[in-house]
Amino acid sequence: MDTTSLTASLSKATIAPTELARRAGVSRNTEWSLRRDPSRAKLGTLRELALACGLDIRIATVEASDPYAAAAARVMVGDLLAENVENQEQLTEWVARLRRWAPDAEPLQLTKMAAEVSAPQSRAGAIFLIGRHDPDRLASAAIASEQPWSLSGAPALDALGIEPISSASPTVLWTSAPAIVMGMLLSTHRKTTVASGANVIVAPLHQTVLAGGANLGGLELVSPVQAVIDSLGVGG
């Protein structure tokens, strides 16, 4: 749940914290805790806080794309060390969730489940491009950005000697600076708003994506299991 706007509203509220807590029907300590991090509050409590600030809450569903889902699957199949994941709480929750979804899942089933909820094209801030998708062109733009990056999807599968399911499987470029990299690619690419029409997906990098990766001939590539998860996520 994205509670950024509510957090900002609570911080700017002209109502005294004690009065805000009274109006919302919560203790002052609870109001203080939720002001810092409302993400774990019950929806009813969040609505009361919002109403006390003159706001209301609207819920909308979006395609899931949680990097910790992929990280959890990688930990479970031995492709990633748990201590290399920043947020242990999120990791633990996803490990438990995947086990609950399929208690006796084989590694491939785990990667498929993780792919459904961590797909690059569904990540907030992902950019869809049509143009050259050869690794050298994408790597040159990523290197020029001087930000962390790694290739996944088709080139990573190719490096592993794995044939993608679809010959049209897009290349995934994970980067800390999607907008900058896109700007460096516009001479050979054009932007599209349709993920299924793109052959290059430039997606915001999460730190777990880099763990276990390798540099092959100047190309930064994700780990084998991350490559499989990403490829399944984009349909390849």
Feature roles, as predicted:
Residues 10, 21, 50:
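The alpha-helix within a helix-turn-helix
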Residues 6, 20-21, 31-34:
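Conserved hydrophobic/aromatic packing and binding residues within compact polymer-binding modules
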Residues 25-41:
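Recognition helix of helix-turn-helix/homeodomain-like DNA-binding domains
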Residues 1-14:
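A short, Lys/Arg-rich alpha-helix, primarily the initiator
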Residues 194-236:
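Amphipathic alpha-helical interface segments
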Residues 101-206:
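Short gly/ser-rich loop at a beta-strand->alpha-helix junction or flexible surface loop bordering the NTP-binding
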Residues 37-51, 62:
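Short, basic-rich loop-to-helix N-cap that marks the start of a DNA-contacting helix
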Residues 51-136:
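Charged, helix-prone or intrinsically disordered regulatory segments positioned adjacent to compact structured domains
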